[in-house]
């Protein structure tokens, strides 16, 4: 039988978002900013205690929400749990964005902002980070005069690693009195900065967080939206009653119950960022200051060939050549052994070429 489905034009106009390739588990995964050292052993112990009865019940949220609110330093009514960080972003479109209304992003950045915007039928305004990967603060402030519904800011930004300072952020919030400001803090733990203390001062501010990075729980899909209680009550209307599964709640509670594990991971990431940047600089590779668990590097025109060689040897990186220029790559800070293995192969396989972009050091 031949039928014609009444598909929305916004869906027809875009391609399917392709998830990472299968078969990554036995590779050196330096491509998606996962915690390759793994979650706390306490998480596995907690998950092992789940019973058939637990699995048969719909999840209950009061106690997990109270515990996670304490972790973030907010009240339970200021916290909304979501099915991963991606879902934390989607709910802003369901709440605030109508077809043909405008949102603003600064690129290169996390692609899901544009993804959800296009599905919602929104008009996407896109500014560019400067050549040195600095945030375009003047252009953002000017754009806020143009009837924007939502401004999305990744802080630190993915993939540049840029951290926007408190002064700049406050300037934005003081101007954005009729615009929702979403601060995506997926990598906040690696930056020593968060806007969470500001949520009661600025009702238009929402902070999105995830347990995929520092807690090492990417497969369980747990995110959070945090904002002042009155504003968050509106967002809550756009959420289903059971957005998060019990296993994710149990795992998150166990992870935050082992803060030493997360602190050690953050300290190791910070150490590796400095060391890897220094080693790459000595090879003539430009890197950019990063406040995330990754580095952005520029290998120039011979970079893509190197990345393919590394993939063939089981080391996965996130090639950003298509949207940033040939040779740009984002490198997750894995374990010390993984980073030594990466640098050893780069020294062996990379053949530098004449540079189109000038080399600068951090």
What function would you assign to each model-found segment?
Residues 2-84, 91:
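N-terminal small-domain helix-loop-helix segment of the aminotransferase-like
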Residues 75-79, 99-102, 185, 203-204, ...:
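Short acidic capping loops at alpha-helix termini that bridge into adjacent secondary structure
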Residues 95-153:
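PLP-dependent aminotransferase-like
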Residues 131, 270, 281-313:
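Conserved PLP-binding catalytic core of the aspartate aminotransferase-like
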Residues 131-189:
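Active-site phosphate-binding strand-loop segment of PLP-dependent enzymes
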Residues 167, 309-313, 318, 322-362:
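PLP-dependent enzyme catalytic core of the Aspartate aminotransferase-like
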Residues 204-288:
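PLP-dependent aminotransferase class I/II
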